[in-house]
Amino acid sequence: MFTEISVNDIKDFQLGHASNKEAGTGVTVIYFPDGATAGCDISGGGPASRETPLTMPMTADNPVNAIVLSGGSAYGLAASDGVMTCLEEHNIGYDTGAALVPLVCQSCIFDLGYGSSKVRPDSAMGYEACMQALKKAGITDSDTCASDNTEPVQGCIGAGTGATVGKIMGMKQAEKSGLGIYSVKAGTFTMTAIVVVNALGDIFDHETGEKLAGLKSADRTEYISCEDALYQFMAPRDMFTGNTTIGAIITNAAFNKAELNKIASMARNAYARCINPVGTMADGDTIYAASTAKRGDSEAVHVDINFAGTLAAKAMSMAIKNAVMNSKISDEEFLSMIK
């Protein structure tokens, strides 16, 4: 019914990354050359986000220009300042009559326990990632960023640079994760899932049930169950910090904001299939859903919302798998980066 394709084959959006490998943090910008209608689902108890009300059905129906994913927890929200500056410099944004205001949504992961907690995504890093996305879109030929047409790197890049999983017993028993991408096509219909996996829980293959990454034993020689570890803490305690899985579903099919909110919530099923435990008060789990279909286009792609939502969950499940499988590093390297 549908086939996997390279995200490079899709021109309705472009990705830009900025990564600080030494500090263990970064930014990913999803830029929409023609804007996008967007929805959002927030299921975690501790989200760090910016301008998510733009995705709500009761707010003005203006297309967003970019979605930003980053590290840095709430500090990382500063990255959108640089994204807005970059877009404004290229005359991209909502025309208020007095000025152009780029419409940018953002969500962050908590990666302050990996690398340096004093170095967080800032305006300059957001600007760099946005410039890379604009260069891929052919809007700028600036040499201030590196960009080519090769397959985008997955794993420890952009917002996934400092992502980790299986942290219920602390970082010494956790494991590296990162950013994953999965794109599919059915006729003229396309869908892409992008995710940064930074979960409290373990990560599983949604098809086989195999544990792919997560909580390890104290000597790091074997995996142990994060769910079983959680059950040791029946009494309330403030110990579960440093998590959040954030992502986006992007399609060229035409949907309104209410429908995209539903698609985002259906895509959340991927988190339940692949992550356990998930959606805790220590997670800020968020999924955006965006449609790049042009408003009023008589030739826009139309598909059933149930088809789109179900496929979104499958694509997100595959992206989660790609995120952890492309982020494997040695125990020695991992332990050198944690507090």
Place the predicted regions along the sequence by residue:
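Alpha/propeptide regions of enzymes that mature by internal proteolysis
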Residues: 1-339
